Amino acid sequence: MDTSLKKNNGALEADNKNYQNYKDEPDKISDVLDDTKYNSMVECCHKNYSTFAPQWDVKERNYIDVPEGPSAKKSIVHRCTII
């Protein structure tokens, strides 16, 4: 079994930071996921990942990524649905 993805601690830290941002500020709709620069899957017991999806849910709240800036380029990050 390939365990290389499990060793990507940087992705796990960045994703946990973003999850915490939404958890602490449930009304904040801005895309804090911009901080996540990794596009690999990470293992987490309380998350079910859907990679490269444009929308995701946190505690039954739905978030849609909105590109910002002059180029309006979508960032490639992982998304998750809390289960």
From Swiss-Prot:
Induction comment from the UniProt entry of this chain: Expressed in the early phase of the viral replicative cycle.
The organism's place on the tree of life at top rank: Viruses
UniProt KW keywords: Early protein, Host cytoplasm, Host-virus interaction
Region (Disordered): 1-26
UniProt keyword annotation of Transport present: no
Localization: Host cytoplasm
GO cellular component: host cell cytoplasm
UniProt keyword Protease, yes or no: no
Protein family membership: Belongs to the asfivirus L83L family.
Assembly behavior: Interacts with host IL1B.
Main function: May subvert the host innate immune response by interacting with host IL1B and interfering with its function.
Name listed for the protein in its UniProt record: Protein L83L
Protein's organism: African swine fever virus (isolate Pig/Kenya/KEN-50/1950)
Phylogenetic classification of the source organism: Viruses, Varidnaviria, Bamfordvirae, Nucleocytoviricota, Pokkesviricetes
